[in-house]
Amino acid sequence: MPVIALDRDRIRSIKVEYNLTEHCNYGCDQCSHLSPYMAKRESSLESFKRDLAALSEVIRFYRFRFVGGEPLLNRELLAHITAVRASGIAEEIQVCTNGALLDRTPEEVFAAIDTLTISWYPDPHCDQAKIDRAIEICRRVGTKVGVLKIDKFRRMQVARPIEDKSLVKDIYDTCEIAHTWYCQTFYEGRFYLCSRPLFTGPYLSKIGIEAPDFRALDGIPLHEPRLKERLAEALRSKKPLAACRYCLGTVGRNEPWRQLPAAERKAPPRPASSLAEMLDRRRLRFRKLLPLPPLRSLLLFAPQGAIGRAAAMFSTSLKRD
């Protein structure tokens, strides 16, 4: 479970992320948000503001992270950033991008955020010139920037539910996405420990498999009484999500990065690999032996006014994710 701190009025956590789009201009195989298979959809600014207002009453984060899909595809990106800044819900705002649209991004977007993270894949749509331009603008406006070269993804999605309950629990307990990287999110009135409940159902439906409504099963309603207590309980829960039965967390085997062809995105085949072939047992054993909270969790126990200064100690880690 992610490390959190409780004040009298609010929960304190490290990070929350928000999917500005479900679709993407890339089609990465093994995308953790299953973006190649999602319909074109941008965040509703009205729904976002409503959920943001509810959350800001009960929780504070060090960082608010915009993801996707590809967040630079959202035409109201700047309005979303402005809403987060006005809410006071986080000390820093981050945008994570594949970099392909950096040359079209207005300078005011770079200036409005605190950190830009570029996931640089071996694809010609993002080149050194685009990255150099982004770095130069970020330096000029005082925004931190991190460039991560990525040439492999881990297997995550399985087509059939994992029946071994102890294995599901082990995968959940060792999941860095939920517990170490603080990839909590919210969407249309519900809060989630990670994004898998949002996207697993639509993917399974696309390959012809009927699945439960993970969005309802795994989401915490944001507009009902006792939100602070219910959020704290969910964040401290040791029980796997319903969607965890269809996920390998961060212990799937690595696969070389590749772009899926359009035909495969439109009509994806069911995965042919067995669970044994997809699961990295060695990594699972290692993660079980090393269930340590991330160093950035120490930020939660710094005095409120010192959090920003203390965060500089962990800037490399925070730029990474």
Predicted regions and their residues:
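N-terminal pre-core extensions flanking Radical SAM catalytic domains
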Residues: 1-36, 218-223, 236-240, 250-251, ...
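Conserved alpha-helical substructure of the radical SAM core
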Residues: 1-95, 101-104, 267, 274-279
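Short, intrinsically disordered, charge-biased short linear motifs at domain edges
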Residues: 12-17, 158-164, 225-236
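Disulfide-bonded cysteines in secreted/extracellular proteins and peptides
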Residues: 24, 28-31, 175, 183, ...
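Cys/His-rich zinc-coordinating "finger/knuckle" motifs
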Residues: 31, 35-39, 182, 201, ...
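Short cysteine/histidine-rich zinc-coordinating motifs and their immediately flanking basic loops
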Residues: 40-44, 254-263
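Conserved AdoMet/S-adenosylmethionine-binding subsite of the radical SAM
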Residues: 74-197, 202
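C-terminal accessory region of radical SAM enzymes
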Residues: 140-155, 196-254
